[in-house]
């Protein structure tokens, strides 16, 4: 209810008198200093508060029969789950750390992890991890059959990629955009040269043909931008200009691959373990996102041909299991190749995984595009932005922000799906670990469990890291939207 304004002189005098009494220091109930800050109740702060809010809050309602029944039931469920969690955690720690065998100083190999019943020195009933087995097979699990003298190349590729990725992720560092651009363009070329040895035998004539083609396409794009052609031909010229820059980058990559770096050539059949897992996962992640964005835009396009082709592509790849794609790429594709043409097995798997993941990524991005209000499109048209300008500056940034969880979920699924390449003869991390189990020199009842534990921990580290970083990006972008 609104207060009435003070008009008369007597009313103003009464107010002044009241105020003078209120601020009189002789009045005992008037506080002259701020009240001290009291600590929060135990149920609201600290570890006790966390326990109450997340565990005990659902078990403290005994004011009614229904509330008491619910509290008792939730308490029973909490006790059962807590018991299961504690016992399984202790069992895992005992298997992996407390009771595990950590070294084999006498070189006994499998006998180092044998019990007395099996002819070893460990007590009867011992069942824990055999880490000497992992130490002996670490090179194959992490690098495959890559030559030992050339492992520095793999480690250098890991180091450069990790430093550049960390540089991009840490906000306080300068030149993050430049480092990010180099990570997406120059680093793949560097990693390919280091891992394969370079010198692919590409002729100068081939590079010249691509260079001339790129210059022609760029010239067409310039003509369209200058207004010499208009309408549909103008749009086609603009697309040709963009393709020209892509072709000239491809020509530059071919020029680098034609240089002899005096490195030993390593066939991809010698790659394996964690190296293969990272190559397949990173290639699929980096290539599937832009391809998925283009497919999502094509499916929502007003052009019937683009919409039809994008829809057919997405529905085809989503309707086929990944293992079928890998089998087709490894077994059936060579049958359709010309005589004498040999397509690298790993490259075939990379193409199949990328196309498969791009179809799922397209649907995730399309969901983000549908979440954008129509007014955003109308606002972009009102300020005179072209289709690609509105997509790049207004629509896509908002759409991708909305679907960060879906994008990262697809990335995590792709990372775990790399284990399927072992079925077609490519030894990824899981395949390499499984192949080491056939070594009779390390045949023990626990070598399989130890190997699978290592693989599970590695997969968990990468997947959990991606999940946490996506949560960080969500919080960061949410704060920027709410400001």
Question: What are the language-model segments listed below?
Answer:
Residues 1-14:
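N-terminal acidic, proline/glycine-rich, low-complexity intrinsically disordered segments
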Residues 14-483:
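Transmembrane alpha-helices and adjacent helix-loop boundaries
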């Amino acid at each position: 209810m609104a207060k009435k304004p003070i008009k008369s002189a007597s009313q103003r005098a009464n107010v002044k008198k009241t105020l003078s009494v209120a601020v009189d220091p002789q009045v005992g109930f008037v506080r002259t200093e701020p009240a001290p800050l009291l600590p929060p109740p135990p149920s609201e702060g600290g570890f006790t508060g966390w326990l109450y809010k997340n565990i005990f809050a659902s078990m403290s309602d005994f004011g009614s029969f229904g509330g008491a029944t619910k509290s008792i039931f939730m308490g029973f469920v909490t006790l059962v789950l807590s018991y299961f969690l504690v016992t399984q955690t202790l069992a895992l720690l005992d298997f992996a750390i407390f009771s595990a065998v950590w070294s084999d100083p006498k070189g006994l190999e499998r006998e180092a992890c044998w019990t007395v019943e099996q002819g070893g020195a460990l007590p009867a009933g011992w069942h824990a991890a055999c880490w000497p087995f992992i130490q002996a097979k670490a090179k194959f699990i992490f690098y495959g059959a890559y030559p030992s003298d050339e492992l520095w190349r793999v480690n250098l590729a890991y180091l450069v990629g990790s430093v550049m990725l960390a540089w991009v992720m840490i906000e306080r560092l300068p030149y993050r955009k430049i480092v990010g651009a180099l990570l997406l363009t120059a680093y793949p070329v560097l990693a390919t040269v280091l891992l394969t040895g370079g010198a692919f035998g590409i002729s100068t004539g081939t590079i010249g043909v691509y260079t001339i083609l790129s210059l022609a396409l760029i010239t067409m794009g310039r003509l369209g931008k200058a207004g010499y052609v208009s309408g549909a031909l103008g749009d086609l010229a603009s697309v040709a200009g963009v393709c020209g820059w892509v072709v000239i980058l491809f020509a530059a990559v071919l020029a680098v691959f034609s240089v002899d770096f005096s490195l030993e050539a390593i066939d991809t059949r010698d790659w394996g373990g964690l190296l293969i897992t990272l190559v397949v996962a990173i290639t699929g992640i980096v290539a599937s996102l832009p391809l998925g964005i283009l497919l999502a835009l094509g499916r929502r396009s007003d052009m019937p041909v683009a919409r039809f082709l994008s829809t057919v592509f997405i529905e085809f790849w989503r309707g086929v299991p990944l293992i079928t794609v890998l089998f087709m790429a490894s077994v059936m594709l060579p049958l359709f190749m010309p005589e004498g043409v040999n397509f690298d097995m790993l490259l075939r798997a990379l193409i199949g995984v990328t196309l498969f993941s791009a179809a799922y990524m397209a649907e995730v991005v399309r969901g983000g595009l549908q979440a954008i209000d129509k007014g955003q499109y109308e606002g972009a048209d009102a300020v005179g932005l072209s289709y690609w300008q509105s997509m790049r500056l207004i629509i896509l940034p908002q759409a991708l922000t909305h679907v960060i969880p879906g994008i990262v979920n697809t990335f995590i699924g792709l990372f775990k799906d790399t284990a399927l390449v072992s079925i077609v003869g490519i030894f990824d991390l899981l395949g390499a670990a499984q192949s080491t189990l056939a070594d009779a020199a390390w045949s023990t009842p626990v070598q399989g469990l130890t190997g699978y534990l290592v693989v599970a921990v590695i997969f968990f580290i990468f997947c959990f890291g991606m999940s946490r970083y996506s949560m960080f990006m969500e919080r960061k972008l949410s704060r920027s939207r709410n400001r």
